[in-house]
């Protein structure tokens, strides 16, 4: 709320219009407007406005001091108001650790309190704990030994969801089986990891370096496991190590070598592992020179970000300038790398666990969609159905080389792109990925259980290779919430958009694929299909699928360009006018009247969020709950599947029946 550089050119307008930034506008306003005027504009209760003014006044009081002359009473008051060490350091103009050591020397440390679950009617003895500076003593003692802290995944958002919570919970359960006292730090009441019976102590507090270090110094555990909760705990690795906290598993230096785009790209060059041409961002002129030398499109990749935040595909100099500005803002402390974006390539992932630098167990999953769709939004298949044996062999070889070079001890994930006989590495995460629960369920082999045992130094025998010989197929499909996000363009890109996922098994890919799609809300098309298949290349690639739809008895409707192409290739279709043409028969009318059962709309470029006809069609399809396909490879596999199975032919079987 304070200690930031957010300002508003029209403050009263910002106060009068509720947005996710209005609380910052209120903080700015309490120093410029009276409370009654702010209340009139926001309708926020005056009690809250006075409390916000107290916080703003504290920031001003802090700014009148330096770290060396800061009064202890003022520092204690700031901590009781909720100021973090970082906020105080920004106000004083000094370092975060300087503030930390200053307050510790003054005896200003948080106390551990139990959350009262009994409404203060009786003393509550719970393992729900939190930190506060408004206390005089701890509610618990810290004499227990053999403790391990697991950092959770934090709040659910796009990119961090229940998959990482599954990893955290399974790590805790394995630690308990091994005889350790388990401590979980997490602050999301939606998670299973914050259930009272999962761990020995639950610290319901934020996942920041300050909080983790405070709890670590209170508890004095054997160490921290940060590799299960996704990107948020992973980002704390170097800070924890630099402060002297024991990070269990893969070393923080290795984590940094993988997360830092420049370091990882340099490592791949050193190992002789192929990767797309790349360059670290220095300035716009150099970026444009690189893009023009390798040819557009290019991919912009910030470091240490969640779910591909600010990752973009630029098609020209104008887009490059816009996206670089966004990426630099999101990833200020770390480098932004530009690389050649390889079109029409397959994306494949390696989820693995390593034991002291040696590959211990792995799973190779294939994306249905070509590269350019974020792995969290992609439809994933295990075992791979269309990946060459030589490609998987080379992926394993590269995985072993990277595991050795980074001395990985625990879970990791590598993303590859393959085109023809060429395999290139695009990313590596030295933590559990969101597909670990999926591969564990498909193989019926808990990768997190194995990873946790290896992290704790348990000597594990090799896994029997028969575990990986499957006579069924698993498919993981993404769940989107575009209906809840007004105006969002429901098209897939390199930045993640899905909010959930479903995995299904089948005796064949097509069966598992259809079951997964039905589970996330798709419906079998009954009669009418609209085709808008994008640029000429896409039209040509989709032609066999259009013929198959016709042969299956579907009525084909199409936009003018697609219809002309189909007619030239002897496929009849009825033309529907574009939304902006305002003539009947119009696509919007057909959608609104429920006359279309499926819409296949292939965008003309990777990223264009403008109010075009294509966008209007996609948005209207989502708003009227008409199944929508925006990816060419997905459309092809979907048509293959409905040609092979009717809905009545899909088997309903339990997971343990496979």
Regions found by a protein language model. Name each.
Residues 101-106, 110-273, 282-289, 507-649, ...:
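ATP-binding N-terminal substructure of ATP-dependent carboxylate-amine bond-forming enzymes
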Residues 259-262, 305-309:
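Conserved A3 ("GATE") glycine/threonine-rich loop of ANL adenylate-forming enzymes
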Residues 79, 85, 91, 130:
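Iron-sulfur-cluster electron-transfer modules
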């Amino acid at each position: 709320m304070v200690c930031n550089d957010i300002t508003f050119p029209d403050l009263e307008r910002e106060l009068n219009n509720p947005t996710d930034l209005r609380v910052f506008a209120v903080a700015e306003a309490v120093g410029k407007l009276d409370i009654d005027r702010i209340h009139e504009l926001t309708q926020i209760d005056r009690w809250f406005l006075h409390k916000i003014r107290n916080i703003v006044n504290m920031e001003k009081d802090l700014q009148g001091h330096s770290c060396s002359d800061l009064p202890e009473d003022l520092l204690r008051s700031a901590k009781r108001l909720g100021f973090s060490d970082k906020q105080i350091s920004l106000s004083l103009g000094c370092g975060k650790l300087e503030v930390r050591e200053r307050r510790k020397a003054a005896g200003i440390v948080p106390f551990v309190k139990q959350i009262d679950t009994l409404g203060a009617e009786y003393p509550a003895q719970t393992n729900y704990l939190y930190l506060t500076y408004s206390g005089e003593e701890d509610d618990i003692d810290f004499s227990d030994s053999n403790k391990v802290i697991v950092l959770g995944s934090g709040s659910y958002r796009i990119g961090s969801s229940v998959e990482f919570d599954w990893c955290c919970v399974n790590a805790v359960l394995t630690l308990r089986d091994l005889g350790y006292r388990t401590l979980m730090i997490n602050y999301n009441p939606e998670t299973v990891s914050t259930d009272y019976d999962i761990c020995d102590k639950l610290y319901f507090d934020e996942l920041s370096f300050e909080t983790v270090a405070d709890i670590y110094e209170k508890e004095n555990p054997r160490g921290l496991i940060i590799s299960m909760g996704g990107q948020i705990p992973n980002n704390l690795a170097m800070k924890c190590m630099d402060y002297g906290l024991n990070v269990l598993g893969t070393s923080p230096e290795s984590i940094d070598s993988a997360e830092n785009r420049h370091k990882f790209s340099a490592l791949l060059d050193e190992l002789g592992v192929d990767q797309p041409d790349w360059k670290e961002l220095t300035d716009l002129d150099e970026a444009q020179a690189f893009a023009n030398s390798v040819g557009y499109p290019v991919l912009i990749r910030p470091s240490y970000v969640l779910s591909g935040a600010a990752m973009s595909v630029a098609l020209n100099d104008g887009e490059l300038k816009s996206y670089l500005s966004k990426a630099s803002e999101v990833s200020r402390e770390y480098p932004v790398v530009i690389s050649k974006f390889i079109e029409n390539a397959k994306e494949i992932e390696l989820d693995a666990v390593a034991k002291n630098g040696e590959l211990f167990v792995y799973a190779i999953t294939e994306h249905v969609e070509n590269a350019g769709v974020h792995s969290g939004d992609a439809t994933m298949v295990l075992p791979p159905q269309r990946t060459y044996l030589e490609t998987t062999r080379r992926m394993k070889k590269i995985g072993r080389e990277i595991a050795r070079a980074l001395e990985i001890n625990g879970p990791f994930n590598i993303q590859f792109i393959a085109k023809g006989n060429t395999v290139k590495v695009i990313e590596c995460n030295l933590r559990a990925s969101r597909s670990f629960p999926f591969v564990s369920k498909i193989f019926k082999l808990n990768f997190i259980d194995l990873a946790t045992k290896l992290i704790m130094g348990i000597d594990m025998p090799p896994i029997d290779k028969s575990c990986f010989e499957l006579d069924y197929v698993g498919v993981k499909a993404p769940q989107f919430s575009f209906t809840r996000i007004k105006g969002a363009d429901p098209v897939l890109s390199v930045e993640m958009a899905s909010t959930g996922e479903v995995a299904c098994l089948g005796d064949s890919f097509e069966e598992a694929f259809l079951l997964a799609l039905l589970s996330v809300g798709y419906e079998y098309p009954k009669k009418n299909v609209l085709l808008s298949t994008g640029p000429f290349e896409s039209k040509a690639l989709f032609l066999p699928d259009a013929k198959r739809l016709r042969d299956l008895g579907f009525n084909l409707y199409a936009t003018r360009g697609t219809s002309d192409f189909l007619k030239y290739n002897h496929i009849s279709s009825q033309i529907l006018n574009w939304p902006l043409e305002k003539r009947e028969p119009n696509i919007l009318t057909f959608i609104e009247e429920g006359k279309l059962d499926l819409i296949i709309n292939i965008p003309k470029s990777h990223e264009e969020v403008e109010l075009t006809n294509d966008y209007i069609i996609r948005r209207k399809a989502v708003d009227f709950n008409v199944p929508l396909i925006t990816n060419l490879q997905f459309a092809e596999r979907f048509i293959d599947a409905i040609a092979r199975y009717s809905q009545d032919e899909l088997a309903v079987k339990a997971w343990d029946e496979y």
